[in-house]
Amino acid sequence: MRRFLSALCLAFACLAAPAMAATSVSDDSQDADKLPSEMPGYSMGMLRELADRVQRTGLGMDMIPALYRPHYLSISDADLSMENEDIVFLVTYPDNRVRVYPRRVLVWHEVVNDVLPDADGLLPPPLPGVPEAAGEEYCITYAPLSGSVVAFRSKAGKYPSSFGVTGYLLNGNSMLYDRVSRSLWNQLLGICIEGPFKGKRLERIPVLSARWKGVKERYGGLDSQFNGKVEVLSRSTGFKRSYGKDPYGSYHSPGTYYDNNHLPFTIDSLDTRLPPKKRILGIEVDSAFGAVQKDAVRQVRVLNFTLGITPLVALHDEEIDAVRVFDRRLQGQEQPLSFVIFEDKLIDEQTRSEWLPTGKSTYGKLREKELSPLLAIDSMWFAWASLYRNTRIFPPPGQ
């Protein structure tokens, strides 16, 4: 523990020094630099520039240990070591399995390499010499300094791979590496900026930030449809860490990293339209980028807006303190719905049908209809804006 905290302090000290570029892959072809990557708005040449701005922090590769095939608990067992206000991250997998990842654990590891069990509830055994190639794998990542949480399918290019933590930063956001080629990937962009997979982008899956109190009540109740189907990441990781504490401070205590606007690392371009550590949901639609202010949505509960030509709505789920973003058009229909709060109920103005903040209608003409969710990335503003340029803010600052 002392060694880890000492390394952490060294990391912040090193960040005060000029940026040190990661070793770049040599490519003198100007034509190659103009080629597009899989990330909208980023050419291969722009990725080269990002790689040149990667900062070394003093932490070596894997000094922050990623988890691989960790253990899980029931909600009732996990509750014994959780606080009601703890932040947790929820992922609903394709088989409708729900897994909960406490931020208290991820802040110490940053990466969880997860493998889903088969239909019989068994984990497939690793293949000889290629442990990454067995099972349906996913990667849940959390970058503490930028507060960004992103989940991916664990494939580097076409190859299954687990991921590790490099200890490098790009605009305060974590850099990861895959264990197949050791290429460098930026967590927030989900793109490889250096190595054999340069220009490739990871397939992202939705992850929801919420509060433990609401999550355990909704998913763990005896009458819950999810009863017995939800698993919580265990603190029994095999590593000695103070999982009850956050090495960076607390969201609830003044005077910590999360409570001020100081950034102890280099930012290429600081967008001052919002405070740097303001919590936002970053969204991407048809190559247009947006940032939804979470606290603004909490206050009004519903926010109708349009990004590009896509009509969207952000809804606050008060029970679990989560914000989701949906397309306001029902499947097969071009005319968008508009949502309001009427007599403390969420309704659409077109049919007066009632809706849940999960995007499902429960009463009226549209009963049982569901809105299509939009993938949204929970992050601090400074990190998102530095990598997703020309981002529109909803609601606009000052409103």
Please give the residue ranges for each predicted region.
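Bacterial N-terminal signal peptides
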Residues: A7-A17
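Positively charged n-region of N-terminal signal peptides that target proteins for export
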Residues: M1-F4
